[in-house]
Amino acid sequence: MKKLLYVTGSRAEYGIMKRLLHTISADHDIELSIVATGMHCDKNYGLTYKIIENDGFIIDRLIDIKLSAENNSYIINSMSICLNEFGNYLEENKFDAILLLGDRYEIYSVAIAAAFHNIPIIHLHGGEQTLGNYDEFIRHSITKMAKLHLASTETYRQRIIQMGEAPDTVFNIGSLGAENSLLLDLSTKKELESIYGSLKKPYFV
C-alpha cells in the first residue's frame, strides 16, 4: 500500500480537491493522510478545517503557522514556521508521495520540506500564470521541485515542458474545478421561484 499525503492550506484549494480526495480514499491500494495548515487553522477565517472533517475526512494533523499577510516580514515568519513544522512532520512520518495544489506561500514551504526529505511531489495546476504576484514564482518553483505534474490545459502542460520537465512526467488532466462545476446539482427555475419569488422581476448579479 502506498502512503500519500495531501496538504491543504485554504478552503478554496480544498474545495477543488474534495471530489478527488474521496476517490483516492476509496482506493484500497492508497493510504491517504491529510494535514491542514494555513487559513484552515486561523479563527479569523472560520477554522475551516472543520469543513474537511464534516466532509468525512480524518485530519492527521493541524499545523498552525501563525498566518499573517500584514506585511512581507510576517509572511516570511509564517513561511519559516511552516518549513520547520513540516520538516519535522515529514521526518516523523514517511510518505511515498505528497499531493500539492497551487501556489500559496505555505504550500511552497511544504514543497521545500518534501524536496529535502526526498519525497516525490505531485503538483496540480502548474504552468499557469499570475503576473505581478508572488504566486507566479512560487508556482514555478514548486514545479521545479515536483516529480509528477498534473496540468489543467495543454498550454500549461507545454509551458511545464518548456521549463525543462520531462514530457513523460507532465499530464494534461483538465481542470478539477471546471469538472466539479459540471457535476453540480443545480436548482430548477421552479425551485428557485419557490424560494425567491418570480424571476421575471429586474435583478442584478
Task: Outline where the language-model segments fall.
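PLP-dependent amino-acid enzyme catalytic core
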Residues: M1, I58-R61, S73-E92, V170-N172, ...
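A structural signal for isolated positions on well-ordered beta-strands in alpha/beta enzyme cores
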Residues: K3-L5, E31-V35, I122, L148, ...
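Active-site and donor-binding regions of nucleotide-sugar-utilizing enzymes
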Residues: L5-T8, Y14-S25, K66-P167
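A nucleotide-sugar donor-handling region in carbohydrate enzymes
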Residues: T8, H40-K43, M145-V205
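Short N-terminal binding/cap micro-motifs at the start of the first secondary-structure element
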Residues: E13-I16, D42-N44
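Conserved nucleotide-sugar phosphate-binding/catalytic loop shared by glycosyltransferases and other
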Residues: E31-I75, E85
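Hydrophobic residues at beta-strand termini and immediately following loops
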Residues: I63, L124, I173
